[in-house]
Amino acid sequence: MMSTLFPALNLNKDEPLPSFTVSELNDWALITMIGADKKSYLQGQVTCDVVSLAQDEITFGGHCDAKGKLWSIFQLFHHNDGYALFQRKSAIETELTEIKKYAVFSKVDISISDEILLGFTGDKALEWINQHTDSNANVRVSKFGTFAKVSDTQWLLVTTDDKKEELLSLLSEATLCDEAIWSLHHIKHALPQIDAPLCNEHIPQALNLQAINGISFKKGCYTGQETVARAKYRGINKRAMYLLSGLSEARPCAGDAIERSVGENWRKGGTIVSAYRFEDGHTLALAILPNDLDEDTQFKLQESIWEKVELPYSLNDE
């Protein structure tokens, strides 16, 4: 059911994006972690360095099984008296089960938060946040809750129902709209995510986690580390996530197959991670593809030809 408070924003490909939007992020959720052993427990579970994470910083990370396959990709930050892991809701029940698997041996409480998640997007979102917070850090505590910087044009606010009402009364400058605009910014920044169809299918490097500082190769042991390290040092990873552009009749979904050209034929080429469809049919998508394809390789999805778009970051190892 469409929200009347956060209506759909119907954009065409060549339209400028709104300079300031606020959306309720119903397709996202938080896992929170508190307790005396929270830091050491999480450090042994995830790809990022929890120990070195400053109070006012945020980092990408992944949680893998013993074979290095991802249960989830998240952004981790300090929240209240513990940690928050911001990630896709469709896979969060599976992720909760997996990340709690060894918690019985530690003083740690792990749960899915019932807090409200609001997404602030656009070039002027930061101006508003600066006016209503006392910090210029990437994670800020305010009277409305915790603000966390997701990308240069995206900020997350973790808040509550009663604070949300007061907040909305102060947002006259913002366009309130549904969370599709958040997805568009996420895709333009080529930020990875794991929805249920991709759960436990790929190693972190297949979703470019190393390129956005989501993997520490200097920290101690964690679940799946051996596979992740081999992918870096022995070159066993054969996939990466790319940004594609094409036309579609309907928005592609996570897990959809995309074909690639091989001579004059087509064969399965990869898997959709996320997509945004403009009103005129133009569509941007992130897809996991072989990382050794020729530059002139074409792709086909929904009987339409798609092409690569340059990523906003480099995939080359340092």
Curated annotation (Swiss-Prot):
Q: Where does folate bind?
A: 28, 182
Report the locations given in the UniProt record. Answer: Cytoplasm
Residues in a coiled coil are none
Concerning Pfam families, the annotation shows: YgfZ_barrel (PF21130)
- Which keywords belong to this entry? Cytoplasm, Folate-binding, tRNA processing
Q: Which is one GO molecular function term here?
A: folic acid binding
Provide a GO biological process annotation. RNA modification
An example Gene Ontology CC term for this record = cytoplasm
Record's PANTHER family?
Answer: TRANSFERASE CAF17, MITOCHONDRIAL-RELATED
Family matches, as NCBIfam families? PRK09559.1, ygfZ_signature
By sequence similarity, the record places it as follows:
Belongs to the tRNA-modifying YgfZ family.
Q: What does this protein do?
A: Folate-binding protein involved in regulating the level of ATP-DnaA and in the modification of some tRNAs. It is probably a key factor in regulatory networks that act via tRNA modification, such as initiation of chromosomal replication.
Protein name, as recorded: tRNA-modifying protein YgfZ
| Annotated source species | Aliivibrio fischeri (strain ATCC 700601 / ES114) (Vibrio fischeri)
